[in-house]
Amino acid sequence: AFNPQTGRFRNFMGFDRRWQEAIGSVDAHGRALWALAVVLGRSRREGLRRAASRLFEMAMPAASGFTDLRPAAYTLIGLHDYLGRYPGDRAAQDTRGRLAELLLDAYKRTAAENWPWFEPRLSYVNARLPHALLLCGESMRRPEMVDAALAALGWLARLQTADGGHFAPIGNDGFYHCNGQPARFDQQPIE
């Protein structure tokens, strides 16, 4: 639910119908922006787009301050659809540029030959990071972003393919730290 006083979405409500957080997580905010941007970019229903537009306009300013990679990636994936319909929105273009650079800079700082990744660990919804960077690299005509995204995505796909050929996401009981062992169980449903 959107909190107009903070300009952020909240995610956790208790059984007593009270919010468990005053502001809301950046993950929840990024996911909400992704959903709203997809509605704005794809929906043919004017009423639905009007409702999404009001929330999107109120919620977007918070995205310019994102420093966490996953909320940035969620927002970027949504902005790809949004800018497909509204390519002249300078504020959205600026936010896309800043968040795409955030991802690319994280990759450049951390990636190594044996660890072509954005962070020193793999945790949850990992594929969204290269997904977002790939979309941005293609739409912004930035080959460096495309190359980094494809290197990371290829490595992740190999890493998360079990011996039998099936998908085996990183478990959340310890995740997978560089030079460590990947957690093979207790995967999250979001994967």
What residue spans do the PLM features occupy?
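Glycan-recognition and catalytic cores of secretory/periplasmic carbohydrate-active enzymes
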Residues: 1-191
